[in-house]
Structures are given as structure tokens and as C-alpha cells.
Amino acid sequence: MNSMHIDQELDTRGLNCPLPILKAKKALTPMQTGQLLKVVSTDKGSLRDFAAFAKQTGNALVSQETIGDDYIHVLKRR
């Protein structure tokens, strides 16, 4: 993931479902097609939630990883 150009980063640490998804949806809206949004969350359920969100919205889930207590998701705007 370090070699990707992230266009916007969103810190949702400390927020529980559905807030990380809602904030990501709001952040993605003004972004251009192909731009990348990195979301950092501490909600373990976000791993499942972001996979479902990407499938429902047509945005691509480029990567997910866990670093310590953080769950990092990278979405590509459709």
C-alpha cells in the first residue's frame, strides 16, 4: 500500500459502525473517478463493512490491512 498515491485520508478512529462508512461515503462524493480514499478505523467490524460498502456502491476496495489497533481501507472512487 505504501506505493499508492492516496488522494484523501479520513481518520475515523474511535467511531463505531455505521459512522466510518457514512463519513467515507461523504468523502467519496466530491472525489473524481479513480481517486483513492484511505480510511483509518479502530472498529473491527469495518473490515466486513467496507467490503460490503464497496460491493454495494461499485467503488473498488483496493486494499485492507491491520496495523496494531488500526484497520486501514483504501477505496477507489468509481
Say what each PLM segment does.
Residues 1-4:
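Short, compositionally biased "basic patch" segments
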Residues 6-13:
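Short amphipathic
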Residues 7, 34-38, 70-72:
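Intrinsic-disorder/low-complexity, polar/charged segments enriched in Ser/Thr/Lys/Arg/Asp/Glu/Gln
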Residues 15-64:
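Amphipathic, hydrophobic secondary-structure cores in small proteins
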Residues 72-78:
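Core SAM-dependent methyltransferase catalytic element
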